[in-house]
Amino acid sequence: MTDENRSIVKQGLSFLNQSCPIQIKALLNQAGYNNTINEETVGFIIGPRLNAVGRLEDASLAAELLMTEDEEEAEFLAEQVEHFNVERKEIVAQITDEALAIAEEKVNNGNQFLLLAKENWHEGVLGIVASKIVETYALPTLILNIDLEQNHAKGSARSIEQVSMFEILSAHQDLISKFGGHHMAAGMTMEIDYIEALEQGLNDWMFKLSEHTSLEPTKHVSVKLEENDISINNIRDIQRLSPFGTDFEKPLLEIDDNEVVDVR
């Protein structure tokens, strides 16, 4: 969220709030959302619903919704999109439960890179599942669906700040049919016969890295506050800095020596 991207997002959010298109309004109606549209609305409400269609089937329904100019049709199509989103959540929950069970065993065995593979996992949601595993264990994770008929495994990987997923997969590309990605994420296809060797290689790589690099999760505190720093004016000043996103994260504030009385 830097440079011209930041300017484009800010103008886009302003437009959505001043004159929200019927297509987006229909999506938000289905989600039961009627507040100010900000970057989190786009990232966690609008985006996932549009993506859900393409993840599970063909994205043409989402495209049809975005192109319609009829309000009644927009509501009808948005309702269908919402059904896909509900189904996507159910599939993610099921696969995540299965993946967490496998991950727990591997973590207990000392694995520092989690390669989780199983048949009949929907490939369209494996990136989401991988992110949830990373959130739980703070370890780089690769989730693969095994296709016995095609004799290959296909899936998505998510990483942690200290580990470049692109670098670690590049170091083992002789075991991978094809892959692409960046520091924090990747997608890949490989032959089933190489899964065990890849898992061993990735963990060996991680063990060498851990000899000189801490893999502990880190938090970067933006500023430490005193109690008298907490005011409506300061909160509004922080909000004026939005939109937040990659490379311009929402500030993390630290307050020491305070007792938590209530959580809502």
Regions found by a protein language model. Give the residues of each.
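Hydrophobic helix-and-loop "lid/oligomerization" segment in the mid-to-C-terminal part
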Residues: 1-193
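Conserved strand-to-helix beginnings and helix N-cap segments that scaffold or border functional pockets
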Residues: 59, 126-128, 199, 232-235
